[in-house]
Amino acid sequence: MWDQTTGITYSDKEINSILEDYRNGAVKTLPARDVTGHGNEVAVIACGRSGVASDADIIIVKLGNSGGNAYIRTTQIMKGVDYCIRKAIEYSQPVAVNISYGGTYGNHEGSSIFEMFIDDCCSTYRCSICIGVGNEGEGRTHYSGQLVSGNVLDEELAIGDYEPQISIQIWKRAMDNARIELIAPTGERLVISERNAGVVHHNIKNMRIVSKAYGPGPFYMGEEIYAAIVATSGYITSGIWDIRFTAANVLDGFFNMWLPPVSTLSSATGFLRPSPEYTFTIPGTSRRAICVGANGRAPGSAATFSGRGVNVKSGLLLYAKPDITAPGVNIRIPGNKEKTVTGTSFATPMVTGAAAMLMEWGIVKGNDQYMYGEKLKACLLYTSDAADDKA
């Protein structure tokens, strides 16, 4: 186990010795603990005594930093994945990596360094990386629109009471020229799309609005407009905020907007006309990873909260996600009859465990040395049940 919060790596012998001393009362506190229980629950489903791959060897990475910041950086996840693969190479074993984590920041097209890193890892070694697509399906945190030259498009954003801050990301093609305004419930209008203006600060009552327009970069030919509304005291103004697009010359016109994850927002906060089609979370947008959604209660149905979407480029369908779904509603944790969990975080380890067992059958037992990567994904999809198209 590698604990990123302390930088300490524990061998299996050290872990067993520490746990034995703890059970015997020789030590009062454990040097590493899963405070939320999320990681333990995921691990138990994937490879616990009653889990899917109960005989698997386990590599654990506790994400985080010594400062105790609750927000995980993408670089920490990348280092964790790299650690798992390097350990697997060291022990000459295939590895199934579980990532029950996702965020909404990014263009969701698989073109970020984070997503491309995951794809490269899937092609580098005998591994399978399984990632949850998130629980944003019903969250009202995404909107897709189409700009038309000379037209005005308004999308309304409801902000509930007691929101201390919120951010809005808009991703569009750089060749599409449009003036974008943020209009407060009290009528103040702010332009947030000025190119080459750097970071722009606005002040409205007790709020500070920070915006910046980012042009194309080495890995993305589009443009990002980012705006953050932060209360300097109390909370930001609740009510209906308007995001207005006044289009000039438009060649493509397609754009997306995302808010922070639904779990961080008030239930009253969200777009009034949300689009559920691009609600998968990053890195569940990775193209070569096995991206996992959650089944609903009805046979063959997807859970309504489960994220979904396609990687698109100029309106062309490239990859549809999730690749596969697994049970993710009211899942009983093995060994804990009282506890149930819901979400794609807990559907994902079921697929990770299945991937580990397929690699054991193929690689470890000598039945198929190429049972990893895209071939393993194809085997899972081929043997799965077809989903209901109406789900």
State what each model feature region is.
Residues K79-Y83:
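Short, well-ordered amphipathic alpha-helical segments that serve as non-catalytic structural scaffolds
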Residues D385-A391:
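A short, hydrophobic C-terminal helix/tail in secreted or cell-surface proteins
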Residues Y105-E115, G132, E136-R173, N177-E181, ...:
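Active-site-adjacent substrate-recognition loops and nearby beta-strands
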Residues M1-T75, S92, R126, P164, ...:
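Subtilisin-like serine protease catalytic core
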